[in-house]
Amino acid sequence: MACCLSEEAKEQKRINQEIERQLRKDKRDARRELKLLLLGTGESGKSTFIKQMRIIHGAGYSDEDKRGFIKLVFQNIFMAMQSMIRAMDLLQISYGDSANIEHADLVRSVDYESVTTFEEPYVTAMNSLWQDTGIQHCYDRRREYQLTDSAKYYLTDLDRIAAKDYVSTLQDILRVRAPTTGIIEYPFDLEEIRFRMVDVGGQRSERRKWIHCFENVTSIIFLVALSEYDQILFESDNENRMEESKALFKTIITYPWFQHSSVILFLNKKDLLEEKIMYSHLVDYFPEYDGPRKDAIAAREFILRMFVELNPDPEKIIYSHFTCATDTENIRFVFAAVKDTILQLNLKEYNLV
């Protein structure tokens, strides 16, 4: 009998040791894998940031991968021009050249989501439309309707994109717009640590899916598009995009789930802010702004303050960076700083510093 008990005790001890070893391993693995949750409203630059991580810290994009974006680039071109053609009617702008009415009808007749090629007569129609003085005036009034940020980038380079041997460049890929539906995870290794970056859809309809992502989040990276101070929401014509972004940020930083997560604020699209601030005045949309006009630095510092002031916890530091998600060198530099911040905070969490 004693022999049996001894065997049972040995087995129990072995099981206990196994459990303890597994728990230690789980804790070690949790420390080695850092979960970064990318949050922000639609079109703030989250997907572009993940693409940059793939370029900087991952496998990048092979020629085959690049070819996979060709169709999306074509669709973005049709989508952008169709948005402007619709806006021409809405804003009651006349075409500079009446021949472009026919070109507009041709482009309008296409279902952009089913576009797979970019050939004649569409190339000529697009080129002619983009050079039209009416369309250019319509482009200048883009804050009054929905137009992708990449419209000008693609439409000024139509001949390159329409070439028979066209393959998407990295910049084409970074600028292509495809709304994120569902949750995209991108894991990458850096200095023996696995970073798991999670991108969730920013449009309102996507936000109910976020709840699953809230466990064990090391850091939240919240993206704000600096250029959206004068724009309306995709989902609602009378709501300011930046006000929506502020409301979302306030909700996120007060969630109990994120009590122990560090918060990093990316004030993105600083390049677009620099262009826009020269003709669209911040004070017209945020009357409390009392800084100089046409001053991008003063404008972005004011926007940063607006977001930081939403933090109700004086103990919680909001780490912030001004970014341009389509600029690989800028993101390389910024993420190196972010990585150091996250690692330092993570070591403190595990009492290793």
Swiss-Prot record:
SUPFAM superfamilies per record: P-loop containing nucleoside triphosphate hydrolases, Transducin (alpha subunit), insertion domain
Region (G3 motif): 195-204
UniProt keywords, alphabetically: GTP-binding, Lipoprotein, Magnesium, Metal-binding, Nucleotide-binding, Palmitate, Transducer
Annotated region (G4 motif), positions in chain: 264-271
Covalent lipid sites (S-palmitoyl cysteine): C3, C4
Described function: Guanine nucleotide-binding proteins (G proteins) are involved as modulators or transducers in various transmembrane signaling systems.
PANTHER family, sorted: GTP-BINDING PROTEIN ALPHA SUBUNIT, GUANINE NUCLEOTIDE-BINDING PROTEIN G(Q) SUBUNIT ALPHA
The protein's name in its UniProt record: Guanine nucleotide-binding protein G(q) subunit alpha
Organism of this sequence: Homarus americanus
Phylogenetic classification of the source organism: Eukaryota, Metazoa, Ecdysozoa, Arthropoda, Crustacea
